[in-house]
């Protein structure tokens, strides 16, 4: 495009790899103050710290749940990415060379040979209702940077739910 066109439109394309001439659209809004946060199995250990034995059933049920990485972007969305299922290095076979350590690995589904969402693939994006009217600013030629979902995230195991199969004894994990 001409210099005049470039001055009046926002371009979210990048050369990938740099200098290749191949342009790809950068799909994720900038992340400035929102720290990516991974939610894995329950970790608050209310049973051990506070002696609350009602937490144990929740811990056991969700100990090996899918790990999800969350981050807020200045595209107005909270993003959730598949971080997979962790499998510890557990090959005790006689075929392993002596003095070797098998490291753990991540897969897309609980069973090592099954398929699921690709590792690093976006599971979903959520736009808070209050931001919907403001998203139009992103497409304006005179766009000035706006901070949307741009604060650190907090994760906690809490006992606020109605007890059911997904929430043993009312426990669940929330993201704030």
Where are the model-predicted features located?
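A fold-level detector for beta-propeller and closely related beta-sheet-rich head/sensor domains
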Residues: 1-176
């Amino acid at each position: 495009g001409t210099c005049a066109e470039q001055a009046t439109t926002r371009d979210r394309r990048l050369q990938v790899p740099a200098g290749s001439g191949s342009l790809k659209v950068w799909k994720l809004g900038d992340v400035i103050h929102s720290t990516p946060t991974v939610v894995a199995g329950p970790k608050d250990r209310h049973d051990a710290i506070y002696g609350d034995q009602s937490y144990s059933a929740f811990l056991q049920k969700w100990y090996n749940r899918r790990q999800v990485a969350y981050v807020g972007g200045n595209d107005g969305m909270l993003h959730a990415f598949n971080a997979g299922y962790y499998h510890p290095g557990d090959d005790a076979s006689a075929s392993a060379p002596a003095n070797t350590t098998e490291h753990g690995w991540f897969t897309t589904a609980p069973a090592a040979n099954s398929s699921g969402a690709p590792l690093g693939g976006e599971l979903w994006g959520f736009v808070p209702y209050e931001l919907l009217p403001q998203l139009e600013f992103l497409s304006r030629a005179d766009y000035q940077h706006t901070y949307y979902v741009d604060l650190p995230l907090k994760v906690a195991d809490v006992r606020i739910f109605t007890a059911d199969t997904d929430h043993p004894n009312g426990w669940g994990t929330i993201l704030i």
